[in-house]
Amino acid sequence: MYVIMVYDVNQRRINKVLNTARKYLEWIQNSVLEGEITEAKFEMLKREIEIIINEEEDSVIFYIMRTTKYSERQILGIEKNKREQIL
């Protein structure tokens, strides 16, 4: 499956969330990561993130796509992390 992760967390936890997510997904730009991931690894990622965040203050959103066949990425402005693979 293909996952896009978007997060808005307290500044004290940003680095922990980013470093954890980068073990599974590719950093795209500030607070956004994406990539192919197995369901098992996705569950591991969610468990690790749940341990880090404070659910009273922080927000993490996962967009899950079973296929990227019909998706397209359009970028306005600079691309923060240039990639070969297009969503």
From Swiss-Prot:
Enzyme Commission number(s): 3.1.-.-
CDD domains: Cas2_I_II_III
Keyword terms: Antiviral defense, Endonuclease, Hydrolase, Magnesium, Metal-binding, Nuclease
Residues that, per the record, bind Mg(2+): D8
Cofactor(s) required for function per UniProt: Mg(2+)
InterPro entries with a match to the protein in the record: CRISPR_associated_Cas2, Virulence_VapD/CRISPR_Cas2
Family annotation (Pfam families): CRISPR_Cas2
GO biological process, one term: defense response to virus
Gene Ontology MF terms in the entry: metal ion binding; RNA endonuclease activity
Source species, domain of life: Bacteria
Family: Belongs to the CRISPR-associated endoribonuclease Cas2 protein family.
HAMAP family reported in the protein's UniProt record: Cas2
Summary of the function given for this chain in its UniProt record: CRISPR (clustered regularly interspaced short palindromic repeat), is an adaptive immune system that provides protection against mobile genetic elements (viruses, transposable elements and conjugative plasmids). CRISPR clusters contain sequences complementary to antecedent mobile elements and target invading nucleic acids. CRISPR clusters are transcribed and processed into CRISPR RNA (crRNA). Functions as a ssRNA-specific endoribonuclease. Involved in the integration of spacer DNA into the CRISPR cassette.
Record PANTHER family: CRISPR-ASSOCIATED ENDORIBONUCLEASE CAS2
NCBIfam families: cas2
The protein's assembly and partners: Homodimer, forms a heterotetramer with a Cas1 homodimer.
Name listed for the protein in its UniProt record: CRISPR-associated endoribonuclease Cas2
Encoding gene (name): cas2
